[in-house]
């Protein structure tokens, strides 16, 4: 799976007739990493959901749609319009905070050790890449702020999987929008 994402990233970047900048390369890697994490999150949630009885699955879907995640108190765009209107710096900063918050919670994902280790590793790599992108895209508006405190709330499996899936989708969306805004030649449709 990693090879496929890396290959697609290289192919997409290679299509452009212009030389690839370090910023473009970092964005391609970051988008590939978060797409992988989002796929893992969807699979974990789906596997968990499939392990339940039909009635429990219905209940899980009701609960998951109303679930409060630890990241819900982060200031972030709430819809497509607000996301597209946000600055690249804001999208990168929110993405960084979401990924950083999952470094802790990923240790509690009830999955195989290999999956948990791989997720933790990818989150760390993505966090470092996002930090480089934030630094590279500073627009003179000041440094990155880590002002809000992460609230650590105990979660059950269903909440953890649902929140992980939701947050990885957010980060994937934010990074894709930021990349498309910075590199219009990437032929993005939002």
Swiss-Prot record:
<keyword id="KW-0372">Hormone</keyword>
<feature type="signal peptide">
    <location>
        <begin position="1"/>
        <end position="17"/>
    </location>
</feature>
<dbReference type="GO" id="GO:0046427">
    <property type="term" value="P:positive regulation of receptor signaling pathway via JAK-STAT"/>
</dbReference>
<dbReference type="GO" id="GO:0031667">
    <property type="term" value="P:response to nutrient levels"/>
</dbReference>
<comment type="similarity">
    <text>Belongs to the somatotropin/prolactin family.</text>
</comment>
<keyword id="KW-0732">Signal</keyword>
<keyword id="KW-1015">Disulfide bond</keyword>
<feature type="disulfide bond">
    <location>
        <begin position="180"/>
        <end position="188"/>
    </location>
</feature>
<comment type="function">
    <text>Growth hormone plays an important role in growth control and is involved in the regulation of several anabolic processes. Implicated as an osmoregulatory substance important for seawater adaptation.</text>
</comment>
<dbReference type="InterPro" id="IPR009079">
    <property type="entry name" value="4_helix_cytokine-like_core"/>
</dbReference>
<dbReference type="GO" id="GO:0048513">
    <property type="term" value="P:animal organ development"/>
</dbReference>
<dbReference type="GO" id="GO:0005131">
    <property type="term" value="F:growth hormone receptor binding"/>
</dbReference>
<dbReference type="InterPro" id="IPR001400">
    <property type="entry name" value="Somatotropin/Prolactin"/>
</dbReference>
<keyword id="KW-0964">Secreted</keyword>
<dbReference type="Pfam" id="PF00103">
    <property type="entry name" value="Hormone_1"/>
</dbReference>
<dbReference type="GO" id="GO:0005615">
    <property type="term" value="C:extracellular space"/>
</dbReference>
<protein>
    <recommendedName>
        <fullName>Somatotropin</fullName>
    </recommendedName>
</protein>
<dbReference type="GO" id="GO:0045927">
    <property type="term" value="P:positive regulation of growth"/>
</dbReference>
<dbReference type="GO" id="GO:0060396">
    <property type="term" value="P:growth hormone receptor signaling pathway"/>
</dbReference>
<feature type="disulfide bond">
    <location>
        <begin position="69"/>
        <end position="163"/>
    </location>
</feature>
<dbReference type="GO" id="GO:0070186">
    <property type="term" value="F:growth hormone activity"/>
</dbReference>
<dbReference type="InterPro" id="IPR018116">
    <property type="entry name" value="Somatotropin_CS"/>
</dbReference>
